[in-house]
Amino acid sequence: MSVPLLKIGVVLSTMAMITNWMSQTLPSLVGLNTTKLSAAGGGTLDRSTGVLPTNPEESWQVYSSAQDSEGRCICTVVAPQQTMCSRDARTKQLRQLLEKVQNMSQSIEVLDRRTQRDLQYVEKMENQMKGLESKFKQVEESHKQHLARQFKAIKAKMDELRPLIPVLEEYKADAKLVLQFKEEVQNLTSVLNELQEEIGAYDYDELQSRVSNLEERLRACMQKLACGKLTGISDPVTVKTSGSRFGSWMTDPLAPEGDNRVWYMDGYHNNRFVREYKSMVDFMNTDNFTSHRLPHPWSGTGQVVYNGSIYFNKFQSHIIIRFDLKTETILKTRSLDYAGYNNMYHYAWGGHSDIDLMVDESGLWAVYATNQNAGNIVVSRLDPVSLQTLQTWNTSYPKRSAGEAFIICGTLYVTNGYSGGTKVHYAYQTNASTYEYIDIPFQNKYSHISMLDYNPKDRALYAWNNGHQILYNVTLFHVIRSDEL
């Protein structure tokens, strides 16, 4: 076969492959074979549904909503794992699709240039073939004037080229098809650009602003949800069995991310050594710990670790000490004026538990009793740096009748005992200076609670119960009005 015929064959083969690829691959690229747009509510496209991500990990999810008898909206909202707004999945797909179409458009542009060049070559050959056909007819009419050998050569050449005439016609049709594809891709690119501008403007400008505003409102809502009214206490989880009947253990609610240390203090008086475990897992499974020696022995089980310091009541005194656990130095000491000590106003179980230090979402607290308040519980909020008393509330609940106490969101909760059947039955709200009697039972698994403290970071109660270190989860009730968001 001659070189021109080989070239035409290659071009035709390439065109067949391109035509087949365009008919099969292009619909899948633009989503025509898998995507169906539907209108919402009477033929109007629901754009808010169309552009929001379908992945629940990338969006705020409202799983249920209702109104109570007073018309307040009650809903369950699950926040995304990442705080930053991720771009819409459909818009990303649109951007990727547009890039593919643009790449395809460039490829078709190159193919079109080659096709036009080859088409010129084919048209030239077509003219040559027509000229040969005309010349052959002339030769047939005047064959007597030519030698038989020349006649046979021309006839053979014409017979070889004649079958290519319909093929060349088909090639010209394919060239028109390529041009049509080029125009359609250009139209599709234009539509996608307009769609991207429309969706992009909504998603990355208006939608981003709306989502950012929603995030701020929900973040404020979550901060409000950090506080609530205690409505339930879970069954206990025994973390470890260790030490004597009395003691305290805790984690730092202000510890930085990754700092999961556990602090352990056995006994309730005349002891100076604090154990530090690297993590809750180490605390549960090993006896590997670092020991810190305090400059003075502690009194009771009301110690707390807060922002890297341990706060404790100095033995046989009403002095509060702030001790830095990193530098192992005393940062501050201050007397808690009029507070009873040395088993004057202890909890019902005794144990020099006159002064009980606590932390909640708002900071550091001290619970104690004074003669001036007839031995009833006094609540004071302390400055965690200076230990200065910021504000004080006098309650009417006798300190010696309380089994244990803890503070959640500025509300003091008091148990009715420390052994046997136990419940939380008194609550004093410092924000309103009011109290109420409640009935929240919880399981006293080992029949002797000598320490019960709330950790606002874990939303859990830490307890020491007859030589067992225990955790309770708490349930808080929240009411957030829409005008508060």
Curated annotation (Swiss-Prot):
Keyword annotations from UniProtKB, A to Z: Cell projection, Coiled coil, Developmental protein, Disulfide bond, Endoplasmic reticulum, Glycoprotein, Secreted, Signal, Synapse
Main location: secreted
Coiled-coil parts of chain: 87-225
PANTHER family per record: NOELIN, OLFACTOMEDIN-RELATED
Task of the protein: Contributes to the regulation of axonal growth in the embryonic and adult central nervous system by inhibiting interactions between RTN4R and LINGO1. Inhibits RTN4R-mediated axon growth cone collapse. May play an important role in regulating the production of neural crest cells by the neural tube. May be required for normal responses to olfactory stimuli.
Subunit structure: Homotetramer; disulfide-linked. Dimer of dimers, giving rise to a V-shaped homotretramer. Isoform 1 and isoform 3 interact with RTN4R. Identified in a complex with RTN4R and LINGO1. Peripherally associated with AMPAR complex. AMPAR complex consists of an inner core made of 4 pore-forming GluA/GRIA proteins (GRIA1, GRIA2, GRIA3 and GRIA4) and 4 major auxiliary subunits arranged in a twofold symmetry. One of the two pairs of distinct binding sites is occupied either by CNIH2, CNIH3 or CACNG2, CACNG3. The other harbors CACNG2, CACNG3, CACNG4, CACNG8 or GSG1L.
Protein name stated in the entry: Noelin
